[in-house]
């Protein structure tokens, strides 16, 4: 996950792109920090991007991506229940065995978000060498460095996000 981008020209400062420096770390130093709406949703028609990578499906593979949020076990079950033969999966390491026979990239252990940050781009790009029609992705909680990982997955998915129950 590349750099954190923050706008210091406004009050309070505004997080434009989460990265290696977490929102929590920024708040320890700066106090109040707002999160730009483009971090958590698609930009609307006519909205101007305030930082690189805000507007478009940055780093998106050719196949459409669906991000499944929620507890890791629930997200894995949701993917199992909804995926079609030949769909690809980006999952936490401990759930890889549930998707035998499907093209798969492991994101890292569900508890190791820094490792997920190191793997997320390679996991997304790997699928461009396959013929999958759909990619399903587990997603870490959007806290700490997980906010950056979730942001990159959600952007790659064009914010096509479902919540596992």
Q: Model-found features: residue ranges?
A:
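Active-site-adjacent structural elements in enzyme catalytic cores
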Residues: 1-165
């Amino acid at each position: 996950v590349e750099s954190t981008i923050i706008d210091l020209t406004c009050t309070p400062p505004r997080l434009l792109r989460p990265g290696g420096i977490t929102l929590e770390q920024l708040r320890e130093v700066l106090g109040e920090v707002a999160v730009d709406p483009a971090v958590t949703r698609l930009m609307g028609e006519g909205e101007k991007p305030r930082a690189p990578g805000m507007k478009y499906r940055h780093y998106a593979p050719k196949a459409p991506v669906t991000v499944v949020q929620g507890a890791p076990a629930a997200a894995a079950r949701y993917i199992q229940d909804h995926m079609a033969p030949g769909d690809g999966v980006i999952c936490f390491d401990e759930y890889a065995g549930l998707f035998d026979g499907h093209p798969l990239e492991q994101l890292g252990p569900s508890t190791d978000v820094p490792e997920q940050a190191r793997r997320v781009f390679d996991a997304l790009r790997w699928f461009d060498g396959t013929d999958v029609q759909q990619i399903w992705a587990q997603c870490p909680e959007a806290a700490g460095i997980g906010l950056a990982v979730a942001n990159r997955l959600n952007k790659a998915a064009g914010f096509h996000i479902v919540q596992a129950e």
